[in-house]
Amino acid sequence: MDYCLSYFSAFNLLMSSSRPFDSSSSANAMVKVPLVPESAPGVATERDLAAYYGHLPEIQGVRLQKEPNSKIDLLIRDVNSAFAKEHVTLHVCQSMMLPSSLLPIDTDLKGFVTSPEFTYLQIASKLDFIGTILAGSALCSDYFLNHDGHGGVSQRQNGPLTNRAAIAKFLSMQGRKRGIVPAKRALQHIVEKARSPREASLALLLCLPYNLGGFNLGTVELNRPIELENRYGEKITRIPDLTIQLKDKRQKRATVLLDYDPATTHSGDQKIMRDLDRENELVTGVQCPHFSVSGEMLKSFESVQGLVRQIRESTGITARDTTMSDLEERQRALWARLFKTR
């Protein structure tokens, strides 16, 4: 192993790659612990890594600000080698790692990347709480970042890189490592199976609790299949983008379905038309409220407030009481972080 990408460099690579990095490959199984390189790979290699990995796309909202001339994050073992570098930021890891925590980037085994679960723990020590939730939701999503894809994303053919259960299992074995407390706390708020960053952001804005700036509508699942009858009485399966379960203090319950703008979430004109047909079937076939949310709507905080009012009015589930005097300020700040164009 010549180098090991970690922290934000690992996150950006994982989220920009269409293929999974296989921890169970025979090649990776041959590598013995300790896996982390002892020191940095050398100036020439560092320069090449910065040129190759330094321009990967990032997800809006994860970091409050993107540092100019971002360096590449590398994991090393020797604390005496962790001095300032022009092209890389060095992070020391002296503990013995399971082989599944470091994944080969290519078959030559020269470059490795930290696993999705390990990466989540690492960046939880660097991000604020909302950023950690967003990063975890991205790692548990069904998309990867792709400049050539519709809306800047494409769909993974092999499913998410990880899931909350796998992350929880990994964290349970990490003792008191740096980042473990916020990583565990944020895990309960992570949403899985999003098909775009904005789909996940919409779910979080609507359903995170008040203290985190959300509208606290209820629990949410993304892209969960539901069974219904169409207008002809035929049994069909449809997959709304968001399924939200609302509940008030008297335990009254209601379900709301939302679909996010197909022109930005999904790919191709035919796919968009299928999504529009799907929305019509959902409206006619399900005995619960259904809403379509456009990208234009999310550009206005007041429009989001209006959507929340409509959802509550359609279900009869009133908002829970709160004593927070700055609630709207918190909600506006979260909306701006997730959706305001910079």
Predicted regions and their residues:
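Short gly/ser-rich loop at a beta-strand->alpha-helix junction or flexible surface loop bordering the NTP-binding
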Residues: 1-178, 334-342
